[in-house]
Curated annotation (Swiss-Prot):
This is Secreted RxLR effector protein 55. It is a single-pass membrane protein. It comes from the Eukaryota. Effector that acts as a broad suppressor of cell death to interrupt plant immunity. Inhibits cell death induced by cell death-inducing proteins, including the PAMP elicitor INF1 from P.infestans. Belongs to the RxLR effector family. Induction: Expression is up-regulated at later stages of infection. It comes from Plasmopara viticola.
Length: 125
């Protein structure tokens, strides 16, 4: 009886140590497919906006001889770079706190299962 309790306790401590060990290691988050598609759509929209801005500014440059064509290109490039930097959110990897909740829930679940098993064994005697 004492041997089974010590083996269960050892097993629980081993599981907790492994869970906490993996929680401390830095893990890089991979970008999801949905985020990649959203960024691609934003990029295509920004490219279409800059293209339409270039065509409208070049047509207005043809109408007005005073404006230089290089200024219109620089303006559209500035708009495109501003749009692309504004649409890209800054993502950091997961933090330690993002692992504490699931690790605690797992430990509590294991303890609850162990308590139920111990209770059933005690009731069968």
């Amino acid at each position: 009886m004492a041997a089974s309790r010590s083996s269960i306790t050892t097993l629980l401590l081993l599981i907790v140590a492994v869970a906490l060990g993996y929680g401390i290691l830095p893990i890089s988050a991979k970008t999801s497919v949905a985020r990649q598609l959203r960024e691609q759509v934003d990029f295509v929209d920004a490219a279409a906006l800059s293209e339409s801005a270039t065509s409208s500014s070049s047509s207005s440059a043809l109408d007005h001889k005073s404006s230089a064509p290089g200024e219109a290109t620089n303006a559209s490039e500035t708009e495109h770079s501003a749009a692309s930097t504004a649409s890209e959110p800054k993502h950091e990897g997961p933090t330690m706190m993002s692992f504490v909740g699931p690790a605690a829930a797992g430990v509590l679940a294991i303890l609850l299962i162990g308590a139920v098993i111990a209770f059933k064994k005690r009731m069968n005697k």
